[in-house]
């Protein structure tokens, strides 16, 4: 090895949270040993952000913009979040879905260094050592987002590249909710991959073996949770894009003892429930009297069903009544309690075919289920494009003046229905929310603004509220409060009004959600911090991209 000395990089330039680039004044440059290390110009943060925005606009592809922002995030954190804050509606699709999916697929090819921690199932004894390399104490971490990348967005298993979904999620926690990025961690739980394309790729950077499952997987996840909670007892443990079976199992196993959160289930449920609450302002029918068909009874669909069930009980229904008014449909059709392959979370909602007069072996599809149940709400979580046909929509309007029809699947190519079609088939009577962003629709001389059931309306505010409360758990009441707070910020008083608030006002939305979550945490006795002026405590906690 050569004894030649190499130039050092000053900490003020190498640490993303400290770096100001050409934002350092000349006095600061002299004090920090940066003389001659930067061009002579000194720019304000606004000027730097304007330069980056100009660079982004000059790029031809969303992936190119994602890569530019990723590198900025890696070296200059304050500027990254300033650009994101100034242009959040435009850049959310770049730093998160859908563009992050493409970035994840190209992770090993484009790897230039990465924020986050990589924990391997092949080295479970190194989990604590890996956390210790960060040099952080028990009071230094508020939020950890981890993924095993088995079910990334709509693209499936992408192994170690899934770290970018955790990084992207944290970026939205900060941009949308003011969660301090210096107090957040992204973690990859690398348990292998079943993606043959990755295993055959000579450049793939993750474990080169099939996904470990069963007892070994469970013990690895348990060890991660125990270690993270012991080292950082105040941290929210957010689980992102786990496979359906593991996502549900982890939440059910640890949700009553640890501050765990699954956005795919709980965040989605809160936002959809918020859209339902807004719809009730139009229909005037109490939640306890609604009947819901869930088309796509997987983890997301039944997670939504669980939250609606809990809200119906809070509205005065018995648990038995609430469950009976939710109708799950999956690949076999309407789910019946005599089916052999029901998942645990589907069982409570499965119907008795004999009570409905359905012969053994007969399949009840969506249209027939609607005729039997006379639902007021139809939720699409199936990823089956076009499943909500004209016949389905007309059946919904036959039993309800203003049916809520929510094609929630992502991306647009997998939506159960196009809003323009639903409005035409329902003669403008349907109340709509979608999972993908949709342009306003003109129908019968009215402009219909279609609310997007985007989880970003919920999870930043939920996280912020939990942090301000120092909550040791995330309870049903807290999620219910978040949904009501989101709905409170939408006012569908006129035909065509959106059922959900605009993400343009995301920081204000998150502040209101955080306050509601905090108050629910106090009410449930899980808060460790109390504040006389809750709103001010929330504002004081929110991190802003600025030079100190």
UniProtKB/Swiss-Prot annotation:
Keywords: Metal-binding, NAD, Oxidoreductase. The active site is at residues 96, 169. InterPro entries: Aminoacid_DH-like_N_sf, Malic_enzyme_CS, Malic_N_dom, Malic_N_dom_sf, Malic_NAD-bd, Malic_OxRdtase, NAD(P)-bd_dom_sf. Its EC number is 1.1.1.38. Its cofactor is Mg(2+); Mn(2+). It catalyses: (S)-malate + NAD(+) = pyruvate + CO2 + NADH; oxaloacetate + H(+) = pyruvate + CO2. NAD(+) binds at residues 297-300, 410, 455. Signal peptide: none annotated. GO terms for molecular function: malate dehydrogenase (decarboxylating) (NAD+) activity; malic enzyme activity; metal ion binding; NAD binding; oxaloacetate decarboxylase activity. GO terms for cellular component: cytosol. PROSITE patterns: MALIC_ENZYMES. PANTHER family: MALIC ENZYME-RELATED (PTHR23406), NAD-DEPENDENT MALIC ENZYME, MITOCHONDRIAL (PTHR23406:SF34). This is Putative malate oxidoreductase [NAD]. It comes from Mycobacterium tuberculosis (strain ATCC 25618 / H37Rv).
